[in-house]
Amino acid sequence: MEDFVRQCFNPMIVELAEKAMKEYGEDPKIETNKFAAICTHLEVCFMYSDFHFINELGESVIIESGDPNALLKHRFEIIEGRDRTMAWTVVNSICNTTRAEKPKFLPDLYDYKENRFVEIGVTRREVHIYYLEKANKIKSEKTHIHIFSFTGEEMATKADYTLDEESRARIKTRLFTIRQEMASRGLWDSFRQSERGEETIEERFEITGTMRRLADYSLPPNFSSLENFRAYVDGFEPNGCIESKLSQMSKEVNTRIEPFSKTTPRPLRTPGGPPCYQRSKFLLMDALKFSIEDPSHEGEGIPLYDAIKCMKTFFGWKEPNIVKPHEKGINPNYLQAWKQVLAELQDLENEEKIPKTKNMKKTSQLKWALGENMAPEKVDFEDCKDISDLKQYDSDEPETRSLASWIQSEFNKACELTDSSWIELDEIGEDVAPIEHIASMRRNYFTAEVSHCRATEYIMKGVYINTALLNASCAAMDDFQLIPMISKCRTKEGRRKTNLYGFIIKGRSHLRNDTDVVNFVSMEFSLTDPRLEPHNWEKYCVLEIGDMLLRTAVGQVSRPMFLYVRTNGTSKIKMKWGMEMRRCLLQSLQQIESMTEAESSVKEKDMTKEFFENKSETWPIGESPKGVEEGSIGKVCRTLLAKSVFNSLYASPQLEGFSAESRKILLIVQALRDNLEPGTFDIGGLYESIEECLINDPWVLLNASWFNSFLTHALK
């Protein structure tokens, strides 16, 4: 980009832009997009004023070449491009001679014909958005705003465009040329995305009373009053590099910028302790489903009817027994709860008309499992404020857990293809504009790659369970409602299929606030023997409930079937996000689209078809101890989708913190790989803030392990 700027713009403009950046302590070699933006803005300001004069009669005239002796005065005074001191001197002088109101911010030009200051904007975004930002910042009706975009759009105060059509067309053509030149060098995308909005300055308002006392009390050292501090902040000149800015700060601050080299970063320290356990709201790769193809039974589509029909496809039920108890729970209660579900489903069958929903009898085992009457009694604060030793109960620090191999296996499985399609190709009608055609083509290619993916099954399962649970929580607050865990898909031949994974029993659900918790017991079918990795199933009581005949290469084999039972809980806000898990498809589609865009911008034509159909090309998928893993574009789509789905399934404060903080190191490492010589301070503090998020969450621990692999290979 730097080379492009030096070739594309007049040397005088380049020099002025460099001076302006240095005045603000910015380096044109590093902030190359900003360098290009400043040059573009300067050039537009100069073009705006070029050839515009005022003659002896005070009329505005356009003269491109003519009599050098004619008594002409430049119509526009150029303020942009001067150093700050000189620029303010010019503004003050104009205000004194023309009685114009002094602007709060340095404008770009003064128009002697219209007697007004002019603010020129050049934007890579929508003109009206940028116009509003400018107007918000300036807050003055006296300054005229004129915005140009790289797409040929413009917007001006009161639609008064000041200049003639031809002068404005010259500016638009030049901007379009700059855009084309950038695109041909693959620079446009990065330039377009790097634009920041206008910073707005808050209005001054008076602070009085308690707030004023608090403000005075919380001033940094060395300041006697809020006024002093305000005056200091207003006069804080942001020139010079970061160190000089820091040295201008309080004497308490002392820090040095350390160079960041290949040897600076160290691997993250991951916690020790027992292996981490499964904590998703439903089973993932270990789930087993009973299915019916081409369902056409009476009441098809009513969850309870579908569930009963699915249950009838299995004939290997046996007397259930506990094979892996829950360490802390009353395990016979879980066993009795399952027997109760079977018995009450059987009772339904004996009724003439099966109801649409089923509320379970409030037995002692269900009351225990759903925590009925377990909430501590609430006491009015007035009744206990005189108790001298009143305190919040001590809570233990969470026990640290180490990374276990099962979470990587879960992730690998989520990226795989199943033999069913879990989403339909959306029919959105005929495309009207060419861009819609490209967009729907990309969507169709992406859908084809992910519709059979296991992560997509998890999305549909999550959406169904959360929707059903939220509905039941609102419709049957006091009831222990039985909710089947169902999903729907299509087979390879296009036949419809309904699947049952198990059941949920919901507890009392008077959910007033978003974070109020509803307890539920989940009971899920599986063929996974919990005794192989008992640490994985710490939160579950597992029963053996039947034997299933499986077809294998050597004939039929009988395998024990298990039921994974646990008490769990969720809240309105979690269910709301769970219902919106389809967003994961959108997020990963957008990531793929930006890859397609980058490819298209390099080649200067739409590369969607080649991108998805070139089966020989491989793309980086992720890091492993072996190095950078690569795969087909379909594999990339499915991996990105699985990451997005796992971020939703394993959402937690630990994940939020880890993602936000570790990203900072990734950005610094990227800057190092781009030879931008990054500098840092308090890198130890950054590591601390990342490592305090590594406690016991399986998905966060796996991401930390990937992060360490990335560091190893990125800095070789």
Swiss-Prot record:
Does the UniProt entry include the keyword Nuclease?
A: yes
Q: Which keywords does this Swiss-Prot/TrEMBL entry list?
A: Cap snatching, Endonuclease, Eukaryotic host gene expression shutoff by virus, Eukaryotic host transcription shutoff by virus, Host cytoplasm, Host gene expression shutoff by virus, Host nucleus, Host-virus interaction, Hydrolase, Inhibition of host RNA polymerase II by virus, Manganese, Metal-binding, Nuclease, Phosphoprotein
Biological process annotations from GO: cap snatching; DNA-templated transcription; symbiont-mediated suppression of host gene expression; symbiont-mediated suppression of host mRNA transcription via inhibition of RNA polymerase II activity; viral RNA genome replication; viral translational frameshifting
EC number(s)?
A: 3.1.-.-
Span(s) of short sequence motif Nuclear localization signal 2 (NLS2): 184-247
Q: How is it modified after translation?
A: Phosphorylated on serines and threonines by host kinases, including human casein kinase II.
Q: Give the InterPro entries listed for this entry.
A: INFV_PA, PA/PA-X, PA/PA-X_sf
Main location (coarse class) = host cell
- Alphabetical list of Pfam families matching this protein: Flu_PA
Q: What class of enzyme is it?
A: hydrolase
Extract the GO molecular function terms from the UniProt entry: endonuclease activity; metal ion binding; RNA binding
Q: Where in the cell is it found?
A: Host cytoplasm; Host nucleus
Amino-acid positions noted as binding Mn(2+) 2 in the UniProt annotation, renumbered to this chain: 80, 108
Free-text remark on how the cofactor is bound: Binds 2 manganese ions per subunit.
> Which top-level group of life is the source organism from?
Viruses
Q: Which GO terms describe its cellular component?
A: host cell cytoplasm; host cell nucleus
Q: Where is the motif named Nuclear localization signal 1 (NLS1) mapped on this chain?
A: 124-139
Cofactor(s) needed by this chain: Mn(2+)
Q: Where does Mn(2+) 1 bind?
A: 41, 108, 119-120
The similarity annotation says: Belongs to the influenza viruses PA family.
Function of this protein? Plays an essential role in viral RNA transcription and replication by forming the heterotrimeric polymerase complex together with PB1 and PB2 subunits. The complex transcribes viral mRNAs by using a unique mechanism called cap-snatching. It consists in the hijacking and cleavage of host capped pre-mRNAs. These short capped RNAs are then used as primers for viral mRNAs. The PB2 subunit is responsible for the binding of the 5' cap of cellular pre-mRNAs which are subsequently cleaved after 10-13 nucleotides by the PA subunit that carries the endonuclease activity.
Quaternary form? Influenza RNA polymerase is composed of three subunits: PB1, PB2 and PA. Interacts (via C-terminus) with PB1 (via N-terminus).
Q: Which HAMAP family match?
A: INFV_PA
**What name has this protein been given in UniProt?**
Polymerase acidic protein
Print the organism lineage.
Viruses, Riboviria, Orthornavirae, Negarnaviricota, Polyploviricotina
What gene makes this protein?
PA
